[in-house]
């Protein structure tokens, strides 16, 4: 948060609990304000009533508005629900969240431009952001090794930016986390996986389990991923990227700690954010 500074931060806390008069979001907002953060609560149209009430309560108290996440289908029906939106559009950041469907949307070609070009009252919103992610929820079914997946969300955003929209379209994604990913119901041992972002693609490394037939030690698999990453001809390493520095250290020294699942998620997310910041205008 120290690095984030005063930059606006959207937060959807709808998965957390609360009552009609008190939601976890209220406490989060209070602590964020005390820390000097510019938190804007985010919600979907279908948000639970208790959470929707807390979002409105925080918005009225903090005076920073609301971020509204809608689906592609809800763009077409905007004229029917915008009349019930509780605060002015000028105080609302609209997020068109394609989630994991972004690759399917890209496959539609130029026909997908129409909903964005005809976005109802497009210039009335405080901001409009396209979000999505092409990382699968699970690598089950993927072959062992490295698979390159296109950054479909960046492809779509780039195409829409060139489609003569009459509003500025901002970019958002899920970094290297699958939009539908979950940690519930996962029983070990599990394959050792990792994800790394280059300019046009995600490099998705699918490994094997650490126990049982065909297994390999976790450390051995992570070190192999690091060695493959540093040898990528189009890697474009970033000098001040912590994630890149950690991966370089793992590849450079056979005695360095090769990391664990949580640390490799951190390396991948940090690298993704730093690279994307360099790519966006």
Where are these regions (language model features)?
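Active-site beta->alpha loop and helix N-cap motifs at the rims of alpha/beta catalytic domains
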Residues: 1-85
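Structural alpha-beta junctions
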Residues: 2-8, 31-40, 60-66, 86-93, ...
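Short loop/turn segments at strand-loop or loop-helix junctions that form parts
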Residues: 11-15, 93-100, 131-135
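Short catalytic/ligand-binding loop motif for oxyanion handling, primarily in non-cytosolic enzymes
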Residues: 50, 102-104, 137-139
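Surface-exposed cleft-lining segments at the edges of enzyme active sites
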Residues: 67-72, 93-107
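C-terminal accessory extensions appended to soluble enzyme cores
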Residues: 108-120, 125-281
């Amino acid at each position: 948060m120290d690095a984030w500074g005063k930059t606006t931060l959207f937060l959807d806390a709808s998965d957390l609990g609360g009552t009609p008069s008190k939601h976890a979001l209220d406490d989060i907002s209070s602590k964020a304000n005390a820390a000097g953060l510019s938190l804007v609560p985010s919600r979907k149209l279908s948000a639970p009533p208790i959470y929707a009430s807390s979002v409105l309560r925080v918005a009225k108290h903090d005076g920073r508005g609301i971020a509204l996440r809608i689906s592609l289908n809800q763009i077409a029906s905007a004229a029917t629900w915008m009349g019930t939106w509780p605060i002015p559009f000028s105080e609302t950041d609209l997020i068109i969240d394609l989630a994991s469907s972004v690759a399917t949307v890209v496959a539609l070609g130029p026909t997908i431009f129409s909903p964005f070009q005809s976005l109802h009252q497009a210039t009335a919103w405080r901001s409009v952001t396209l979000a999505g992610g092409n990382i699968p929820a699970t690598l089950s079914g993927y072959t062992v090794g490295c698979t390159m997946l296109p950054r479909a969300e960046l492809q779509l955003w780039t195409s829409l930016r060139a489609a003569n929209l009459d509003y500025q379209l901002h970019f958002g994604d899920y970094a290297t986390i699958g939009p539908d990913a979950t940690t519930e119901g996962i029983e070990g041992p599990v394959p050792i996986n990792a994800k790394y972002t280059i300019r046009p693609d995600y490099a998705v490394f699918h490994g094997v389990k650490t126990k049982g037939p065909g297994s390999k030690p976790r450390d051995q698999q992570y070190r192999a991923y690091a060695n493959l990453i540093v040898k990528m001809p189009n890697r474009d390493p970033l000098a001040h990227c912590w994630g890149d520095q950690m991966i370089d250290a793992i590849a450079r020294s056979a005695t360095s700690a090769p990391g664990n699942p949580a640390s490799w998620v951190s390396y991948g997310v940090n690298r993704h954010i730093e690279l994307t910041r360099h790519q966006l205008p």
